[in-house]
Amino acid sequence: GIAESLHPLVQSRFRMPRQIDYYFSLQSPWAYIGHTPFVRLVSTYDLKVNYRPVLLVDLFSETGGLPLAKRHPVRQRYRLIELQRWRDKRGLNFHLQPANWPFNARLADGVVIAVLEAGLDPEPFLQRAYPAVWELELNLADPATLVKLADDAGLPGRQLVERSGSDAISAAYEQNRQNALDAGVFGSPGYVLDGEVFWGQDRIELLDDALKSGRKPYSSVGEGQESD
């Protein structure tokens, strides 16, 4: 049809928004570094984002990864170099080793789930919470800090933080972990478009290419280009 012959950016105006699953944790520096370009991409292609906060320590343990403290010193040192490179590349100004990091992200990630559960937009909170960790060195394991961040985002902070500690939110958090494993996601950020995983904020440009071209998703057995 006519819509199918148009550029993908124009096509998006003729149909329901494409969906993308966004697996992340507020604990992750890479999710923070990639968040602004990801949001820009979402706007450009009119994507519907399915936000999936996930507990990284569990995801790592089940997929062969290691938390930072258990990695070889060579890998730890290289990570600091990469953070500096991407800090410059993305035009950011953040601490490589912020005072209150690492932290238990269950409550902070749970606030995002609670926001979604309430039918609200998590973006205003995320756009405050990410820099709160990496630029302002705030403690996102502290309930009062989370309440203020949510309030500043125009959200009911106290109610959301209370809800974040509930069994229902914990169950949703666990379900996100299982969904991540089922999707083939093993770190943060993980972007899943039509079943194709893009791991890491340094894959955003490749995600852009996939959206721009309108190509079929690639698979691990090389069938991405085959016709139906």
Please state what every model-predicted region is.
Residues 15-17, 59-62, 76-78, 90, ...:
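Generic detector of short, locally flexible boundary/turn motifs and exposed helical patches
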Residues 8-10, 111, 115, 177-180:
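Short, charged low-complexity linear motifs
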